[in-house]
Amino acid sequence: MAAQEVLLVTTPEPTALVDAYAMVKVVHLRDSQKPLWLLINNAQNQEEAEETIEQLQSATKRFLNRELNVLGMLPTDPFILQAVRQQRGVVDLFPQSPAAMALHAAARQLQEKIPLQKDGFAAFWKGLSTEGL
């Protein structure tokens, strides 16, 4: 994989959790050292997001002996549907909406925790050339 970090976005639905775990497993088998970040989308509340995180963390720890870096959650937000209908980003169209605020918080957290790499683009191309498309 050419990416140096992996951001996994999933929802609380059981089928989505199965898919998310499958993706974690694929990434882990290809590169067990690659950092994995988890963001829960469309959570009804903080409790639902935390339960979802715990379920995925538990399976990942138990079967892969691996921890996920948790970014947090994006709440269910009616402004997202409005933005989709207008074919615009929720952050641009409704910057004060709960989803936009949560996206900003997740982006800030990523910025703080992932060092900016000056050779990021070069590393990307090197990854493509050595790992294939």
Model regions and ranges:
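NTP-binding/hydrolysis catalytic cores, primarily Walker-type P-loop NTPases
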Residues: G89-L133
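G-domain G4 guanine-recognition motif of GTPases
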Residues: T11-P12, L36-E51, M73-I80
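Signal for well-folded cores of large energy- and translation-related assemblies
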Residues: K25-H28, Q44, K61, P75, ...
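Conserved C-terminal guanine-recognition region of P-loop GTPase G domains, centered on the G4
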Residues: L17-L36, N45
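Beta-strand-loop-alpha "switch" segments that mediate conformational coupling across diverse proteins
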Residues: L64-G89, L103
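Inter-motif core of Ras-like GTPase G domains
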Residues: M1-T15, V24
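Short helix-capping segments at alpha-helix termini
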Residues: D31-S32, K61-E67
